[in-house]
Amino acid sequence: MDCKVPPTPQAHRIPLDPEAAAELAVGFKALADPNRITLLTLIAAEESGEACVCDLTEPLGLGQPTVSHHLKVLVDAGLLTREKRGTWSYYSVVPGAQQDLFNAMTERTTP
């Protein structure tokens, strides 16, 4: 008895190579923390499209070092950008980065 589901006739799935899987894992690991998801939504909701770390501590109820750590993880995963202005860092969401992460899992097909 074969338990494999046959591929759909329209498309053939392409498995991820180990390097691509490792890159995806970084992004998904960054999103695996509720505080990081909250940070992304807070920054995305800003009218200016960016937020200073000093404005993100209170909504999360976390200290500045902890918030800065979470922001660094999101930057390293390519989900946020960071711009230093004087003593403060400002963060903005990378356009399309979240969607690209999810598309990499679902759109790995060839006709």
Model-assigned labels for residue ranges:
Residues 1-31, 77:
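N-terminal leader segment of winged-helix/HTH proteins
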Residues 58, 69, 75-76:
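Alpha-helical residues within the helix-turn-helix
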Residues 97-101:
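Short, charged/polar, Gly/Pro-enriched secondary-structure boundary elements
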Residues 41, 68-72, 87:
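Base-recognition residues in the alpha-helical recognition helix of bacterial helix-turn-helix
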Residues 76-85, 92:
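Beta-hairpin "wing" of winged helix-turn-helix
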Residues 22-63, 89-96:
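N-terminal helix-turn-helix DNA-binding core of bacterial DNA-binding proteins
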Residues 102-111:
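Short, charged, intrinsically disordered terminal tails
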